[in-house]
Amino acid sequence: MDTQGVATDPQLQQFIEIESQKQRFQQLVHQMTEVCWEKCMDKPGPKLDSRTEVCFVNCVERFIDTSQFILNRLEQTQRSRGAFSETMTD
């Protein structure tokens, strides 16, 4: 199979996009785990105490909120740049 066939195969493109999304999600989970572990875990034990559990829950929620805010902001920036470039070409 030649590379042009790969570039135009919609099923392959969809598969690649799905795998890329999975990879990005795994990277996000890894990053979130690392950040929250460093922030909340004083010393590993046989089970989490309530303070540590609350810290993890809050950390994960803030991490998700922050990630969503950044994604929304990037989308707004891209839309405004697209609208700006369209007005420049008219």
Swiss-Prot record:
The UniProt record lists the keyword Ion transport: no
An example Gene Ontology molecular-function term: metal ion binding
Localization, UniProt: Mitochondrion inner membrane
UniProt-listed InterPro entries: Tim10-like, Tim10-like_dom_sf
Membrane topology, from the record: Peripheral membrane protein
The record's note on its domains: The twin CX3C motif contains 4 conserved Cys residues that form 2 disulfide bonds in the mitochondrial intermembrane space. However, during the transit of TIMM8A from cytoplasm into mitochondrion, the Cys residues probably coordinate zinc, thereby preventing folding and allowing its transfer across mitochondrial outer membrane.
Protein name from the UniProt record: Mitochondrial import inner membrane translocase subunit Tim8 A
Native source species: Danio rerio
